[in-house]
Amino acid sequence: MRLLPLLLLASTLLFAEINLPENFQAKFIQKITNTKKHVIQYPGKVQFSDEKRFKWSYVKPTKKEVCTDGSELVVVDHDLEQVSSYYITDGLDIAKILKKATLHSKNVYVAQYKNIKYTIQIDSKQKLHSIAYFDDLDNKVQIVFKNMKYGKGNLPAEKMKCNYPRSYDMIRG
């Protein structure tokens, strides 16, 4: 009889997965550590909706917004008064990354996606807490989320767009 609860627990852990909400909003700190151990921190707010739409609003060291709908990436640098727009074919697909994630230890998951290993941590309420990986330049990237709020339904499309004055320079890539 003692074996049954252990088998149930083992099967639950074996098939545990991270549930992605329809939308989320949070504050974050993105910490980038280069190969010489130099660290730069970028705090801000993030919004996610519709499996592919992101809006990252950075407040330091420069005020910047990064928005994507999965096919176009828009970067607004308010200090430079410049907007860069790129069509992307291979963007960050958080839904696919989380679907590939397997439980590594309590509240820690690991996912291999497009030759990058992601370490994903969830909090005690099963909400996304952090994502860490090494980028193409061997920088360690860690994003820690705070005040994570999950929601149902998609956020309004207008809320997910980067806003900028028409006077900003536009660069298309």
Task: Identify the meaning behind each predicted range.
Residues Q30, Y58-T62, G70-E72, D79, ...:
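A mature extracytoplasmic/lumenal domain signature
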Residues L3-L14:
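Sec-dependent N-terminal signal peptides
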Residues N19-K37, Q47:
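A short, Trp-centered hydrophobic/proline-enriched beta-strand micro-motif
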Residues I40-G44, K64-V66, Q82-S84, Y118, ...:
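Short beta-strand segments
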Residues H78-N115:
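Flexible, surface-exposed loop/linker segments and immediately adjacent secondary-structure boundaries
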Residues V39, K106, Q112-I116, D123-G173:
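Non-transmembrane domains of secretory- and envelope-associated proteins
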Residues K45-D93:
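An acidic-aromatic
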Residues E22-K27, D50-K55, H104-V110, K125-A132:
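Short, hydrophobic/aromatic-rich segments at coil-to-beta transitions
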